[in-house]
């Protein structure tokens, strides 16, 4: 079962990368038209941006994501003994190399894993998580993150994060140019042009508006399924669902994190933004996760 899940995640990685490039190309066409009146130039430029983002994120995933989330590396057990030894123990049980360990200075309890594969993975925990959880609950949370590492979920998450970051960059570039740059002077020309030109202009705006939602849908589909799988994986490592159940209840009642990179929100074990009733929530409701764990 584990081998099949790993292979499935690898196949999904390929499909996600194809979808990533396609979506970036569409956004590039829209931005290229708004900026340069050239769909082809926009597509080529956007694909170059997308490839650069993907390569950077995949090859330097740990350092990039940790920098985005203000993580500080723990280089020895003396710096954070409980966290260090918990990560060490869970990695040993899961039979994966010990990930690098990071701490995020934030009173809200949370954690995430990142990297490209189990050999260069990393686990981050907030100071709030270390302070709030007892050893068993901490094992449940870290077991969840180690399961992401073992199942290659971190690679999929890294590519999804690159997708979101690249699209945000392109849309911000296009929006700023259109509103404040020479694009603002071109609007009258486009409006007075032919109907076909105006139609392409409108479609370009529609793409820029809805592309982030498409990216969110992709992240949501990936994140929801992998969270359930990682919960089950944590129980397989700790042999006690009550550890993770207790931890999830504490996470559910915690306040939002003070400083968090929004594009990284899907990586965390619990929604760090604590936004209620979001249409495109990347996390399944904690109540549903607890209900599934109680049936194990």
Swiss-Prot record:
Compartments, record wording: Cell membrane
PANTHER family: PROTEASE HTPX
Family: Belongs to the peptidase M48B family.
Keyword field: Cell membrane, Hydrolase, Membrane, Metal-binding, Metalloprotease, Protease, Transmembrane, Transmembrane helix, Zinc
Record: active site: 145
InterPro entries: HtpX_protease, Pept_M48_protease_HtpX, Peptidase_M48
GO terms under cellular component: plasma membrane
Pfam families documented for this protein: Peptidase_M48
Membrane topology classification: Multi-pass membrane protein
Binding-site positions, Zn(2+): 144, 148, 227
EC number: 3.4.24.-
Segments traversing the membrane: 14-34, 38-58, 159-179, 198-218
CC cofactor: Zn(2+)
Co-factor binding comment: Binds 1 zinc ion per subunit.
Gene Ontology biological-process annotations: proteolysis
GO molecular function, one term: zinc ion binding
Name of the protein: Protease HtpX homolog
């Amino acid at each position: 079962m584990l081998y099949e899940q790993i292979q499935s995640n690898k196949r999904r990685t390929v499909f996600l990368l194809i979808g990533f490039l396609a979506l970036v190309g569409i956004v590039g066409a829209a931005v290229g038209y708004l900026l340069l009146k050239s769909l082809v130039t926009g597509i080529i430029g956007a694909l170059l941006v997308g490839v650069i983002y993907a390569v950077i994120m995949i090859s330097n995933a740990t350092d990039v994501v940790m920098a985005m989330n203000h993580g500080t590396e723990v280089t020895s057990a003396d710096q954070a003994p409980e966290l260090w030894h918990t990560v060490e123990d869970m990695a040993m049980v899961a039979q994966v190399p010990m990930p690098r360990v990071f701490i995020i200075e934030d009173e809200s309890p949370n954690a995430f894993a990142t990297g490209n594969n189990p050999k260069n993975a990393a686990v981050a925990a907030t100071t709030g998580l270390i302070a709030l959880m007892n050893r068993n609950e901490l094992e449940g949370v870290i077991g969840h993150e180690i399961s992401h590492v073992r199942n290659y979920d971190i690679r999929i998450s890294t590519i999804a994060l690159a997708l979101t970051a690249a699209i945000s960059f392109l849309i911000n570039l296009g929006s700023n140019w259109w509103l404040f740059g020479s694009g603002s002077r071109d609007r009258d020309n486009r409006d007075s042009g032919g109907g076909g030109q105006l139609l392409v202009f409108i479609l370009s705006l529609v793409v820029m508006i809805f592309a982030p939602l498409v990216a969110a849908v992709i992240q949501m589909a990936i994140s929801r399924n992998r969270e359930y799988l990682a919960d089950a994986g944590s129980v397989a490592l700790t042999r006690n669902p009550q550890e993770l159940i207790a931890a999830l209840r504490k996470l559910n009642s915690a306040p939002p994190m003070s400083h968090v990179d929004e594009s990284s929100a899907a990586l965390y074990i619990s929604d760090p933004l604590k936004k209620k009733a979001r249409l495109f929530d990347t996390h399944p409701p904690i109540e549903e996760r607890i209900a599934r764990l109680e049936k194990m």
